């Protein structure tokens, strides 16, 4: 995506290009999914760290404030789904942190911006999640997931992400009904 910006003070125009990852165009990312306690599976791609985690799946419908959500201690240990379709476009702004670290266990978005644009930004969301060992999942229909959580209530879930032995065993279990039942019991 390319956007033209007009700087009022300098009376100049500059062009900024953004690389945006969408669910269907992420060849360089690893396979990932979320498995809900009710057995539903939403497949997508990995960003941030990779591995296998469990937690309570919740959602937030905020159009901005992803930095505040990630650093809010009230989300401690939860898998948070962000319904707004593009996350990360204004980067990381330490002044906006609610605390000194990320508190969510997992983070789910429709798409994320690799090259944020903000004069205050200090990095991108993918690098930040990796640095704090937080698993991210992108490329899924976050609104469909939110509808399930809204109608059924919050429920436990598991994110499976990457190519580790643990992740590959969990992906294999999803294809076998008896192994899937064992996997669901771990949630």
Q: Which residues does each PLM region occupy?
A:
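RNA-binding accessory domains that recognize and position tRNA/RNA substrates
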Residues: 27-187
């Amino acid at each position: 995506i390319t956007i033209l910006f007009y700087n009022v003070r300098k009376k100049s125009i500059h062009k900024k290009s953004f690389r945006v990852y969408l669910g269907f165009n992420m060849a360089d990312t690893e396979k990932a999914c979320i498995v809900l306690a009710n057995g539903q599976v939403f497949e997508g791609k990995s960003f941030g760290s990779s591995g296998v985690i469990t937690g309570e799946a919740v959602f937030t419908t905020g159009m901005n404030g992803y930095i505040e959500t990630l650093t809010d201690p009230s989300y401690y240990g939860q898998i948070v789904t962000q319904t707004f379709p593009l996350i990360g476009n204004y980067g990381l702004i330490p002044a906006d942190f609610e605390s000194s670290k990320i508190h969510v266990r997992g983070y789910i978005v429709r798409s994320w911006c690799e090259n944020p644009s903000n004069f205050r930004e200090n990095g991108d969301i993918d690098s930040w999640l990796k640095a704090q060992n937080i698993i991210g999942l992108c490329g899924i229909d976050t609104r469909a997931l939110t509808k399930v959580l809204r109608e059924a209530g919050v429920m436990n879930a598991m994110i499976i992400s990457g190519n580790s032995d643990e992740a590959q065993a969990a992906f294999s279990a999803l294809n076998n009904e008896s192994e899937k039942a064992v996997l669901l019991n771990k949630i």
